[in-house]
């Protein structure tokens, strides 16, 4: 029978000092036999996805205390990728994932907490907390802040839905008037919550649901809706039950590594492919799998991508649907239901509620459930009122979207595409693979060949795109922007957005060893591995080289002979200490980022730290 970890600091005469300090936090004698549960919050006023979380930790804590636990809250950092985008701030985004994971480990282990409730929401916060949860392997429940309502505005006598990416594109489009650009900017992000499309934050919150570590509805129920409060209340109660099951009944099924098993990781990736999620989820799932000591690799993702269809299409791949529409159609469970009926899921998995997949679908799939309360929850909709307050409205759709032929979520028979929303490509400069979000690629350019225009920084590429130096048919290559080379593996949302602004979104490709925002669409291929800074062949590409992209056949090829590539590699190695570094880039890199770069692996390993360099 495992002993409460917290007993280390609450029991025994030699822990009198620790108990004295616990008493100073408000604990009493009666508390010293109870489980201490960390409420891991990420409130910050910097990030719209987190600005409403200040009081939600207290909400969870009250339920923990009422159920017989002791709640202790702390905060992690949270970087807003959208605000950090397009300047040096983006160098810090991905490294912040490791800092978040480490800080959770530090706090929980230093104070011997028994379990956690993780209150996350945005791009690197959910993955960082997920990595920490699987590393620590103590009972955990995730409950995120929820998606933002979609922006809406009237243009050309039509009400259209908007999001952050629209503001970026229109702001850079010389054909758009100042007044229209201003109108879109003011309308794009109307409420608190994670950006309204199937971008990285919402993708990851959907995946925690598929992994079984959060409750049904977590990935899609709006931040502003009153129904979301129940998820927080339930999380506080349920974590005490899970904690007691493990420590008092020796039930290891309550542990995250037994919930988020390899079968669950496969289900999560299947969901990701079916819903056309962000390519960043590949990075984060690979990283989380390593923390869980699960053998889940790019090869597994490649196999799944070849058999899973696209059953859901959401912004940025279409402006018709946002997360509020996914929720109306049944949310994550609605997509999982269609995948299950198609025979594409592992059914022998459980979630934090203790339900198997068939039980979860029976109770929460809008196509199966007889529970009116569940149907009512999935009718929770937007209010269209600007606010930064959680749970501030209770508007509902008149009906559910259960049209599996033409609605937001489709059945296998009516799939948007028999090919899934993500694909892994391999070739002679991506020997370990690269990732493309096929959900956002126009059918006309699934096969594409063009001459390379090579840039060694995102900034130079943006300048060239806006300066008219990139033309139809070009393949823009941005290298030395990987985890080590950037360092920090910047997102390339501005280059892809500006290609659209310049009318090149369907006639150009962009390839990088960096990554893309979840808001990216178009022929945008990232995570090229090995990266240039690690000696990857992307560092050998020269202006004018032809590059052939073949998504249907999962290929990407630099049309240069092996002999020529060998000669280029020899010349590169002859640069000595300067080999595999940018030739014409000046970038100030802090000590903190250099420390990150010294241990970073390429994207095919999840951009995690290389444990072999630490002797582990």
From Swiss-Prot:
Its cofactor is [2Fe-2S] cluster; Mg(2+). Its EC number is 4.2.1.9. The keyword Heme does not apply. It is an enzyme of class 4 (lyase). Binds 1 [2Fe-2S] cluster per subunit. This cluster acts as a Lewis acid cofactor. GO terms for molecular function: 2 iron, 2 sulfur cluster binding; dihydroxy-acid dehydratase activity; magnesium ion binding. PROSITE patterns: ILVD_EDD_1 (PS00886), ILVD_EDD_2 (PS00887). It catalyses: (2R)-2,3-dihydroxy-3-methylbutanoate = 3-methyl-2-oxobutanoate + H2O; (2R,3R)-2,3-dihydroxy-3-methylpentanoate = (S)-3-methyl-2-oxopentanoate + H2O. Mg(2+) binds at residues 81, 123-124, 491. The active site is at 517 (proton acceptor). One of its GO terms (cellular component) is cytosol. Keywords: 2Fe-2S, Amino-acid biosynthesis, Branched-chain amino acid biosynthesis, Iron, Iron-sulfur, Lyase, Magnesium, Metal-binding. This is Dihydroxy-acid dehydratase. It comes from Escherichia coli O17:K52:H18 (strain UMN026 / ExPEC). The gene is ilvD.
């Amino acid at each position: 029978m495992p002993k409460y970890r917290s007993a280390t600091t609450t029991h025994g005469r030699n822990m009198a000092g620790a108990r004295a300090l616990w008493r100073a936090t408000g604990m009493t004698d009666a508390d010293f036999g109870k489980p201490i549960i960390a409420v891991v919050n990420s409130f910050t006023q910097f990030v719209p996805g987190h600005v409403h979380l200040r009081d939600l930790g207290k909400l969870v804590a009250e339920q923990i205390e009422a159920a017989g636990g002791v709640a202790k809250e702390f905060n992690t950092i949270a970087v807003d990728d959208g605000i950090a985008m397009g300047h040096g701030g983006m160098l810090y985004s991905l490294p912040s994932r490791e800092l978040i994971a480490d800080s959770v480990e530090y706090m929980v282990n230093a104070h011997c907490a028994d379990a956690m409730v993780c209150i996350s929401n945005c791009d690197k916060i959910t993955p960082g907390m997920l990595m920490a949860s699987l590393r620590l392997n103590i009972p955990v429940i995730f409950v995120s802040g929820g998606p933002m309502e979609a922006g809406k505005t009237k243009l050309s006598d039509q009400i259209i839905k908007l999001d952050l990416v629209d503001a970026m594109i229109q702001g850079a489009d010389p054909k758009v008037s100042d007044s229209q650009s201003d109108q879109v900017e003011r309308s794009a992000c109307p409420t608190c919550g994670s950006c309204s499309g199937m971008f990285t934050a919402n993708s990851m919150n959907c995946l925690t649901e598929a992994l079984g570590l959060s409750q049904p509805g977590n990935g899609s129920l709006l931040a502003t809706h009153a129904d979301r409060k129940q998820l927080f209340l339930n999380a506080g109660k349920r974590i005490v039950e899970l904690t007691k099951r493990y420590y008092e009944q020796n039930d290891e099924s309550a542990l995250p590594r037994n919930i988020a098993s390899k079968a669950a990781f496969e289900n999560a990736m299947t969901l990701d492919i079916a819903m056309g999620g962000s390519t960043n989820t590949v990075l984060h799932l690979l990283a989380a799998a390593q923390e869980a000591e699960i053998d889940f690799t790019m090869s597994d993702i490649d196999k799944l991508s070849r058999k899973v269809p696209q059953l859901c299409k959401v912004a940025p791949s279409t402006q018709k649907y946002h997360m509020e529409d996914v929720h109306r159609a049944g949310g994550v469970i609605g997509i999982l239901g269609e995948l299950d009926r198609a025979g594409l899921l592992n059914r022998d998995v459980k979630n934090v509620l203790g339900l198997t997949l068939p039980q979860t679908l029976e109770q929460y799939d809008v196509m199966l459930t007889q529970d009116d309360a569940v149907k009512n929850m999935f009718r929770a909709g937007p209010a269209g009122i600007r606010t930064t307050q959680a749970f501030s409205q209770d508007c509902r759709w008149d009906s559910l979207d259960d049209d599996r032929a033409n609605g937001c979520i489709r059945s296998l028979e009516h799939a948007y595409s028999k090919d899934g929303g993500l694909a892994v490509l391999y070739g002679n400069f991506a020997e370990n693979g690269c990732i493309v979000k096929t959900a956002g690629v126009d059918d006309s350019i699934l096969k594409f060949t063009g001459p390379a225009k090579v840039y060694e920084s995102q900034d130079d590429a943006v300048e060239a795109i806006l300066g008219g130096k990139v033309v139809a048919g070009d393949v823009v290559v941005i290298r030395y922007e990987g985890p080590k080379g950037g360092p920090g593996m910047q997102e390339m949302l501005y280059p892809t957005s500006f290609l659209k602004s310049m009318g090149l979104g369907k006639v150009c490709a962009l390839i990088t060893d960096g990554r893309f925002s979840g808001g990216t669409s178009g022929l945008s291929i990232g995570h090229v591995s090995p990266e240039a800074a690690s000696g990857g062949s992307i560092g050998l590409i020269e202006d004018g080289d032809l590059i052939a992209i073949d998504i249907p056949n999962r290929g990407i090829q630099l049309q240069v002979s092996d002999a020529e590539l060998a000669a280029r590699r020899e010349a590169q190695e002859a640069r000595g200490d300067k080999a595999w570094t940018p030739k014409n880039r000046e970038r100030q890199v802090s000590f903190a980022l250099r420390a990150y770069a010294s241990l970073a692996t390429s994207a095919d390993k999840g951009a995690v730290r290389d444990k072999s360099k630490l002797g582990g």
